[in-house]
């Protein structure tokens, strides 16, 4: 059943899974869907941790004005391959205030990462525009779709991980698609005014993102506003075939490398107005085959919260091993948690506080008349709220059995037991 309009917001209709698959099979290729309803996306892709491409998600977004084309977003061919003049630099400069933005130089690396720098946004636009005009970029051809981008000489500057939505909260340049609205991570961070995981990426042809899996083992989604991206993406576990003798993963991959190591992988050619859903633990690398702008989120919810917890535990173990020679020091466990937060982004206390926050809101759904709005647009039906509460109960029960939590001087077990008591039903 499709999401329903109610009092100006959209109701996320979730219903019990009709056919329970204990061992979901990987698809032969990544599906491209249009008109997918929320319930189907939830059970067919998100719950099974399977990627999908969803078309026609950004037709009415304000940021369609960031592109140069026909007279209105509705009349443009959003899936056409853009020319060098596709970026509306004048509109971007007028609409978005100047200020520092994070930039990666894709032609320079430092400790297995692209070199990072900071530029003022308007300076970045000027450099990008000048590069297009001076290079007279060759037209996109279909032959490029099946070949990786060859690095050019000089700087190759990619504006990445820009918190534009947080920086300009009054500028509603996009709307979170309904498929991705169940987002525990950003629900908490936005409400509490903390750094979130909502990003804008802008980059020229030949810019790219190196081989990685997403932060926390989270889901991610990426919607192209303009441009064409190529993805190489693989199911969890396949990345182990690429480890060197020290267990290190490569910085960059290509089809030849993957074929030589017998890696199962998929190729995605993502067009404008399409969203790619990236499940937890799927390693990937992405190339911009044309000048490209995208909106991206990292997030997790009841479908993958257990994977995030497992990654958190694994990273704590790695931290403890790294400083194992300091085990006799006072507050060793607390020091490990501090290092865990620094390296992983959250620690055990942060994770429990997030569970407490989401639980409080879902429990309130059953006791107050007003529903909480997700991203100012969406509410959950009763079954969806119940599903979230059941997932919260299961993961909290798992936490109470963890030795680190049981022995924590921060009384983490007491907090988990208290949360578990509130979730009993």
UniProtKB/Swiss-Prot annotation:
UniProt KW keywords: Cytoplasm, Dioxygenase, Iron, Metal-binding, Nucleus, Oxidoreductase
General function of this protein: Catalyzes the 2-oxoglutarate and iron-dependent C4-lysyl hydroxylation of eRF1 thereby promoting the translational termination efficiency of eRF1. May be involved in regulation of chromatin structure, promoting expansion of heterochromatin.
Pfam assignment, any one: JmjC
Residues annotated to bind Fe cation: 212, 214, 284
Compartments reported by the entry: Nucleus; Cytoplasm
JmjC domain location: 165-316
Identification of the protein by name: 2-oxoglutarate and iron-dependent oxygenase JMJD4 homolog
Tree of life domain: Eukaryota
Gene: JMJD4
GO CC terms in record: cytoplasm; nucleus
């Amino acid at each position: 059943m499709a999401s329903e309009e109610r009092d100006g917001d959209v109701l996320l209709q979730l219903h019990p899974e009709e056919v329970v698959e204990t061992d979901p099979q990987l698809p032969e290729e990544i599906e491209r869907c249009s008109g997918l309803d929320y319930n189907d996306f939830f059970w067919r892709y998100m719950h099974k941790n399977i990627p999908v491409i969803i078309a026609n998600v950004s037709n009415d977004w304000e940021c369609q004005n960031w592109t140069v084309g026909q007279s209105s977003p509705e009349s443009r061919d959003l899936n056409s391959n853009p020319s060098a003049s596709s970026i509306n630099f004048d509109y971007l400069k007028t609409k978005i205030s100047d200020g520092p933005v994070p930039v990666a130089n894709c032609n320079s690396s430092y400790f297995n990462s692209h070199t990072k720098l900071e530029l003022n946004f308007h300076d970045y636009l000027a450099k990008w525009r000048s590069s297009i005009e001076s290079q007279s970029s060759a037209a996109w051809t279909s032959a490029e779709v099946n070949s990786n981008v060859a690095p050019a000489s000089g700087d190759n500057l990619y504006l990445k991980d820009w918190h534009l939505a947080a920086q300009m909260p009054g500028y509603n340049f996009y709307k979170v698609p309904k498929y991705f609205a169940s987002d525990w991570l950003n629900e908490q961070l936005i409400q509490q005014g903390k750094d979130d995981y909502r990003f804008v990426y802008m980059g020229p042809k030949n810019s790219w993102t190196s081989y990685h899996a997403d932060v926390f083992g989270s889901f991610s989604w990426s919607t192209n506003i303009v441009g064409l991206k190529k993805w190489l993406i693989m199911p969890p576990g396949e990345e182990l075939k690429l480890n060197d003798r020290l267990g290190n993963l490569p910085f960059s991959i290509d089809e030849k490398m993957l074929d030589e190591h017998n890696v199962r992988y998929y190729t995605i050619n993502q067009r404008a107005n399409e969203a790619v859903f990236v499940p937890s633990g799927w390693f990937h690398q992405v190339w911009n085959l044309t000048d490209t702008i995208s909106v991206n989120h990292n997030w997790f919810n009841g479908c993958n919260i257990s994977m995030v917890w497992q990654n958190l535990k694994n990273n704590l173990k790695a931290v403890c091993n790294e400083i194992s020679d300091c085990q006799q020091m006072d507050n060793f466990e607390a020091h490990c948690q501090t290092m865990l937060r620094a390296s992983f982004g959250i620690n055990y206390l942060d994770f429990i506080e997030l569970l407490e926050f989401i639980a409080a809101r879902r429990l309130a759904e059953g006791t107050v008349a007003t529903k909480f709005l997700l991203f100012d647009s969406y509410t959950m039906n009763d079954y969806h709220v119940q599903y979230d509460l059941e997932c919260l109960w299961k993961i909290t029960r798992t936490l109470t059995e963890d030795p680190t939590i049981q022995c924590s001087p921060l009384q983490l077990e007491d907090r988990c037991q208290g949360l578990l008591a509130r979730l009993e039903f």
